[in-house]
Amino acid sequence: MSCRPSSVSIAVTGSSGVRVALRLLEALKGEVEIRGIILTRGAEEVARYEEGIEPEDLRRLLRSYAPLYMENDMSSPLASSSNQPDAMAIVPASMKTVGLIARGIPSSLPARAALAVLRLGRRLVVAPRETPLGVVELENMLAIARMGGIVVPLTLSFYIKPSSVEDLVDFAAGKVLDALGVKVDVYRRWRGPEEGD
């Protein structure tokens, strides 16, 4: 799929970097239809610790973007291959979710929806934020790439000359947007060393 998607779904799982998911949703709003958001309990815990957002407040915020489904809601429309969007992003992607997708185990809604997207030949973007990476984690990400998924690690970038954490968040969200095929300028793109500041 090389064209811009008209619809996307987003899964927010229990890894550091929930702020990137929130920035991604902010950038997507008004650009494409957000078919649904999947939230895990682990993501709620991370949001509480990293951002000081209580679970009920996080759910309310996410519902302002799209219908919200919890990780065990297998009755969600996103659980069915008959109702998949053009693209899906898992941001941040926990190693648990990465492992389930890589092994084809649809035991959570994020994994089930991702596997349905892949089966249909649609775009799946998986954004892990984990370090260091061992053999198991690398093999799981390789398996997803071989299945047609796009792996976008949430890494730091210094060529953008960040002046704040928000600059780094924008960069990470922008890379996910690029992989989804949704061009929204949220970060400074490389134009060569001559460009200057």
Curated annotation (Swiss-Prot):
It catalyses: dimethylallyl phosphate + FMNH2 = prenylated FMNH2 + phosphate. GO terms for molecular function: flavin prenyltransferase activity. The keyword Magnesium does not apply. Gene3D superfamilies: Flavin prenyltransferase-like. FMN binds at G14, S15, S16, T40, S94, M95, K96, T97, R129. Dimethylallyl phosphate binds at Y159, K175. It comes from the Archaea. Its EC number is 2.5.1.129. The keyword Ribosomal protein does not apply. Keywords: Flavoprotein, FMN, Prenyltransferase, Transferase. InterPro entries: Flavin_trans-like, Flavoprotein, UbiX-like. Flavin prenyltransferase that catalyzes the synthesis of the prenylated FMN cofactor (prenyl-FMN) for 4-hydroxy-3-polyprenylbenzoic acid decarboxylase UbiD. The prenyltransferase is metal-independent and links a dimethylallyl moiety from dimethylallyl monophosphate (DMAP) to the flavin N5 and C6 atoms of FMN. HAMAP family: ubiX_pad. Belongs to the UbiX/PAD1 family. This is Flavin prenyltransferase UbiX.
